[in-house]
Amino acid sequence: MKYGFTKEELLVFGKYDPSEVQISDPALESYICLEPKYVPHNHGRHANVPFAKQKVFIVERLINKVMRKGHNTGKKILAYNIVKEAFEIIEKKTKKNPIQVLVDAIINAGPREEVVRLKYGGIAVPKAVDTSSSRRVDIALRNIAEGARRAAFKSKRSIAQCLADEIIAAANNESRSFAVAKKEEVERVAKSAR
């Protein structure tokens, strides 16, 4: 019994156990929080505290990214239901724990190297730099949500189906995933700017 709840009550969406999830990238272990919550909603308590977002449950962070812009701004229950439906689709298609698939997708979609612009005597010079683990998780989640949003735009498929396909493709490291394609593009530019 943890935090006054039984183990059955702390399953994500009442179905998925985060305790059996393995994080294969040691650099991201302390930045992907798998501590379950009864309801994945912390009322933005992490907003003004430095580095507090790494203690926010990873499923809640995905829900927040899905809620991000346009018609879905501020509609957390809608975003919650989208992610819940996407997880059900992922479980049907892959026969795996959807949280494990999401973690694999984040590991594959986070860029390891980026480009910054340095100014030398009025001339901007691109320079390749390593990406921090926290930023890797942020960019991966943002690109997964953005890829789902773009795939669902002017499409018959629901955003939940598009989100599920995006997460599965990113977990398999396929280039048809928007997030993986974006990561490869950023790393290619960084390689040329070394």
UniProtKB/Swiss-Prot annotation:
Presence of the UniProt keyword Ribosomal protein in the record: yes
Keyword Ribosomal protein belongs to the record: yes
GO biological process: translation
Quaternary structure (record): Part of the 30S ribosomal subunit.
Role, per record: One of the primary rRNA binding proteins, it binds directly to 16S rRNA where it nucleates assembly of the head domain of the 30S subunit. Is located at the subunit interface close to the decoding center.
UniProt cross-references to HAMAP family, sorted A to Z: Ribosomal_uS7_A
Record-given protein name: Small ribosomal subunit protein uS7
Source organism per UniProt: Archaeoglobus fulgidus (strain ATCC 49558 / DSM 4304 / JCM 9628 / NBRC 100126 / VC-16)
